[in-house]
Amino acid sequence: MSGRVFVAVPTARAAAETPPDRDRVVDGARAAALLVVVGGHVVMAVVAWPDGVPVLGNLLAAYPWTQALTWILQIMPLFFFAGGAANALSYDRHHARGGDYASWLWGRGRRLLRPAWIYLALMAVIATAVTLLAPARTAEPLMLLTTQLLWFLGAYLLVTALAPLFRATSRRGGALGLLLLLALVALVDLARFALGLPEAIALLNFVLVWAVPAYAGSLRAHGTLASYPWRAMVAVVCAGFAVNAVLIRYGPYPVSMVGMPGEPVSNMAPPTIVLAVHAVVLAALVTLLDAPLRRLLERPSVWRPVTGINLVAMTLYLWHLPVLIGVATAAHALGLDRPVAIGDGGYPVPAGWGYLVGSIAFVAAYAVGVWAVVRLLWPLEHAPLVWWDAPLASRRPGPTTAAWVAAAATAAIGICTLMISATGLAGFPTRTIDYAGLPLNAAVAIAVMLAAGAALRWAGGDRVVEAQTTVSSSAA
């Protein structure tokens, strides 16, 4: 790692070294989804500070007609679609080289969790200091947000562990597996809304709903989606929109595909059948537009920034929300708050044109902050951590034992990450909250994550003997 504070992202070199068979549409979908998330959060955030206490609102709640736009702009499923395709291709290559499930899952988890460990370590220190030094009523609403976006990492790890199952099912059953997943999601919603079962049943959909786009990505990787005529994709898109319109009109579901403050039901947390159908629509749209997207992404002027975004993806995703919190807090401390009012629901709404004018400076400060933080921290996303990446001296377990341990450890990490995303770091490390009838504590979840991470490394990590053999072979 360079001694400079800011290390340039090697975008041009990485773009030039792109393998000719790489699925650029998958990378483009991932980059587009990330940009919408990073830009969407700053646009939607509305903050008021009555008596010095931050109250968080949402621009979409202030103008309900805009919530229909989320039927296009909610593109988080594209992360899972792209990830499902990448996982399928990665597992195929690993399997062809004779690699086992545990070592493959460790390879995926190691790369994903490295920036998360750094994020949690820094945030835990900050949260502890804030808990000790700042008034709880001021700090708590903001510290609740610090881990909110970790839900993605938790859900993604869970569906990544299922990649071999998706691989086998997509090759044998094709799109029937997708219909089965949709049916399971619908059954969970039925149990939740119609049968009156405990709210905790809905937590199953954190796996099932996000498995839908991940499975669709596996279908893409194995050529199944490309085998369908374009008319079929148009029919899927139209049918998906129609089904969701009926579900929202006659069911308990809100219009918005993102969470709204104060709403009794969210399509995002826990996710619902509406979001699962939306994921299928997005997968069909990407398939329908595959040819023009490929041509677009062949252009160096387009492909270079896409490559750059993917190189810093986890850093950008994890750190943009803390930057947003910091900018909002600094603006308030400097007396530069955007003018807001408290709406009928008790949440802040923009107040006149002054809000728009103030937002120009707010967004500019946010963009500069995100740029600086990403440039500062992105090398850590790729730099090995000694306690995490170094080869182990212990013997490798047998493949069956390793597979079960790796799967269980990944599931534990995924579940604990979802727990931390729900609790936030307010009151860290002692605060416990109730979520869907379950007691959750962030410090306990982090401790379990660390233990499960050690188990995953033991099951699939490199060994010292293997590393020495590789070096000897290279020298020869």
Locate the predicted segments by residue.
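Alpha-helical transmembrane segments and their immediate juxtamembrane cytosolic regions
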Residues: 2-476
